[in-house]
């Protein structure tokens, strides 16, 4: 997308933040209008995260106008909202490449720009990192300032409060900006969000802090702060002791779409010492009516026609694994009211929307709190219920201690439905599900299942749900199934693989949904093909039988080779003193960058041609 200067005359004058700061303050509202339109025009043509960025246009402009970035540090929590930041920091003409192979990274990324001071992607990390930078800046004593922008969803996570508690003790010069739009990805839940709603619907406090008076002095009354109430607030609202008890000087709420007021407030706050907290009210999807009306659907979008206001409908086709999981969940809950489903703020992505509506008493969205989700499930299991934790592979990393300490050691029957296992695609390094097999495999008594299609996925969910000997995990990918017919649910024999094809000399041991590619390769080279199904317990008898009958073995998985399922096969063969060549195929020892799933599989030789090529190169050594 080429930049049209005539269409965006003010934005054309601000291709860098240095140019932005040369603009007269009075031109900033026009700049914001053009920036918002440019974001709409570019994302509609290229796809990407959308509604979050629309909501922070004025805040982004104001922060870069006031703060001396990149000398001053500006941190965006999660990063979904950082497209305007990228546009203003020299990447305007490349914004159409975002989330594409070799394009701009979907999140702030240190290797991409000096303005991106922290790699992000997971939530609630900004205040901890920002505090560390602020303490370092204090020791440096050069006047460097640090500001963190965190959403009302991300701030509910425990890590954010741990950081604020420490910040209040350190007294470092740190600004935390709460971008409060009452929307994370799913609707926010929990007492903190309810508290903020109460603040906004209550009467203005008469007691104002002196610093607050100075910061807001000269500003017009706040307009249009209408959340869960039809009352208009005027002046400044102070939320009890919520943030001040943590040692912060609280200012706000202020209108996040009044760029001139934001500039005024931020200029005053930049001069204040110690931890500062600015509460900014914004509207997710601001300026584009369809996104304002339905910010969840417009959170991340494919290419679309802005004039129509409609997102393209997904082509009717094979069901996604997330949908298969959601259907199984509802089917099981209908027959068993002891089922309790737990998700850390990923209802839509995990396929749980229908379940949450049909079985509200068996559904728990614990917000962005993966650690709590897992230990909460442990408590449900102790109480005699049957918890199912629906969680993305990349987010399960955040609850590893709870998985071991609170679930596995106690051998509690908790089922983990691990979505987005393997290559996820455009969101890149922070979201690929490469490590789950490796970090789960070393946990004693953990059952790990890797379905090859949607029917096996259902059978494995059923198997794990009825397994009472300890925790179990079913790990399935992002994307659609293969069209396999769905059979009646039944428990699979624990730790048993299935031979799919008999061949000669070589056997391919497949773990997971690369089975179609493995089948194509097995046909081409006349290899035995096995659907191993279980990473743990491993079908040791079958592996040893295959080793005795073949000259070499190939293990195949869409996950980290180091510590993965193939490593389990290697360990068994070494322990049994079976000397046979083994090639482990999977993801290498590196973080996987953005791209489509097909592009990444091709690049890492995990499509059929690549697998066959890896085998041929190995045999030729």
From Swiss-Prot:
Binds 1 Mg(2+) ion per subunit. Its EC number is 2.2.1.7. GO terms for molecular function: 1-deoxy-D-xylulose-5-phosphate synthase activity; magnesium ion binding; thiamine pyrophosphate binding. Thiamine diphosphate binds at residues 80, 121-123, 153-154, 181, 288, 370. InterPro entries: Dxylulose-5-P_synthase (IPR005477), THDP-binding (IPR029061), Transketo_C/PFOR_II (IPR009014), Transketolase-like_Pyr-bd (IPR005475), Transketolase_BS (IPR020826), Transketolase_C (IPR033248), Transketolase_CS (IPR049557). GO terms for biological process: 1-deoxy-D-xylulose 5-phosphate biosynthetic process; isopentenyl diphosphate biosynthetic process, methylerythritol 4-phosphate pathway; terpenoid biosynthetic process; thiamine biosynthetic process. Mg(2+) binds at residues 152, 181. It is an enzyme of class 2 (transferase). Disulfide bonds: none annotated. Pathway: Metabolic intermediate biosynthesis; 1-deoxy-D-xylulose 5-phosphate biosynthesis; 1-deoxy-D-xylulose 5-phosphate from D-glyceraldehyde 3-phosphate and pyruvate: step 1/1. Homodimer. Catalyzes the acyloin condensation reaction between C atoms 2 and 3 of pyruvate and glyceraldehyde 3-phosphate to yield 1-deoxy-D-xylulose-5-phosphate (DXP). Belongs to the transketolase family. DXPS subfamily. This is 1-deoxy-D-xylulose-5-phosphate synthase. It comes from Erwinia tasmaniensis (strain DSM 17950 / CFBP 7177 / CIP 109463 / NCPPB 4357 / Et1/99).
């Amino acid at each position: 997308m080429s930049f049209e200067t005539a269409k965006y005359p003010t934005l054309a004058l601000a291709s860098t933040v240095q140019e932005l700061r040369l603009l007269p303050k009075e031109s900033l509202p026009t700049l914001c209008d053009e920036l918002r339109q440019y974001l709409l025009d570019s994302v509609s043509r290229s796809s990407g995260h959308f509604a979050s960025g629309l909501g922070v246009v004025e805040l982004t402009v104001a922060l870069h106008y006031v703060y001396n970035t990149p000398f001053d540090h500006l941190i965006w929590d999660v990063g979904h909202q950082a497209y305007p930041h990228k546009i203003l920091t020299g990447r305007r003409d490349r914004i159409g490449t975002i989330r594409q192979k070799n394009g701009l990274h979907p999140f702030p990324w240190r290797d991409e720009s000096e303005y991106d001071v922290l790699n992000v992607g997971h939530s609630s990390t900004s205040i901890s990192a920002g505090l560390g930078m602020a303490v370092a800046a204090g020791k440096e004593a050069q006047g460097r300032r640090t500001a963190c922008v965190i959403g009302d969803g991300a701030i509910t996570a425990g890590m954010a409060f741990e950081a604020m508690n420490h910040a209040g003790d350190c007294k470092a010069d740190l600004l935390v900006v709460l971008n409060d739009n009452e929307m994370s990805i799913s609707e926010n839940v929990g007492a903190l969000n309810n508290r903020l709603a109460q603040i906004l619907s209550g009467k203005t406090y008469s007691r104002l802090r002196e610093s607050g008076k100075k910061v807001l002095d000269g500003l017009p009354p706040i307009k249009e702060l209408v959340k869960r109430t039809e009352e208009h607030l005027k002046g400044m609202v102070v939320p009890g002791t919520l943030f001040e008890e943590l040692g912060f000087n609280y200012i706000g709420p202020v209108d996040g779409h009044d760029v001139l007021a934001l500039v005024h407030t931020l200029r005053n706050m930049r001069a204040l010492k110690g931890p500062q907290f600015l509460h900014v009210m914004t509207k997710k999807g601001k300026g584009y009516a369809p996104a304002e009306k339905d910010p969840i659907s417009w959170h991340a979008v494919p290419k679309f026609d802005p004039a129509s206001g409609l997102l393209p409908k997904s082509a009717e086709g094979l069901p996604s694994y997330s949908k298969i999981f959601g259907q199984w969940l509802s089917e099981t809950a209908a027959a068993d009211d002891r089922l309790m489903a737990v998700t850390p703020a990923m209802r839509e992505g995990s396929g749980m929307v229908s379940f949450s509506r049909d079985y509200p008493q068996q559904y728990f969205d614990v917000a962005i709190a993966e650690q709590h989700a897992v230990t909460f499930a442990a408590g449900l299991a102790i109480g005699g219920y049957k918890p199912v934790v629906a969680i993305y592979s990349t987010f399960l990393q955040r609850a590893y201690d709870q998985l071991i300490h609170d679930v596995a050691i106690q051998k509690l029957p908790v089922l983990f439905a691990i979505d987005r296992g393997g290559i996820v695609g455009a969101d890149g390094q922070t979201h690929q599900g490469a490590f789950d097999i490796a970090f789960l495999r070393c946990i004693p008594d953990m059952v790990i299942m890797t379905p090859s299609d949607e029917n096996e996925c259902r059978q494995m969910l059923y198997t794990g749900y009825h397994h009472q000997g300890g925790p179990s995990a079913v790990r399935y990918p992002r994307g659609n199934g293969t069209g396999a017919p769905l059979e009646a649910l039944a428990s699979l024999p624990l730790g048993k693989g299935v031979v799919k094809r008999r061949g000669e000399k070589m056997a391919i041991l497949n773990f997971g949904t690369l089975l179609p590619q493995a089948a194509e390769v097995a046909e081409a080279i006349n290899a035995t093909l096995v659907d191993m199904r279980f990473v743990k317990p491993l079908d040791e008898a079958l592996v040893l039988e295959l080793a005795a009958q073949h000259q070499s073995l190939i293990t195949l998985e869409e996950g980290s080779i180091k510590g993965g399922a193939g490593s389990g096969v290697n360990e068994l063969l070494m322990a049994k003193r079976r000397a046979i060549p083994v090639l482990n195929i999977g993801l290498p020892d590196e973080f996987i960058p953005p791209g489509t799933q097909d592009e990444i599989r091709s690049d890492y030789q995990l499509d059929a041609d690549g697998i066959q090529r890896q085998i041929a190169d190995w045999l030729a050594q």
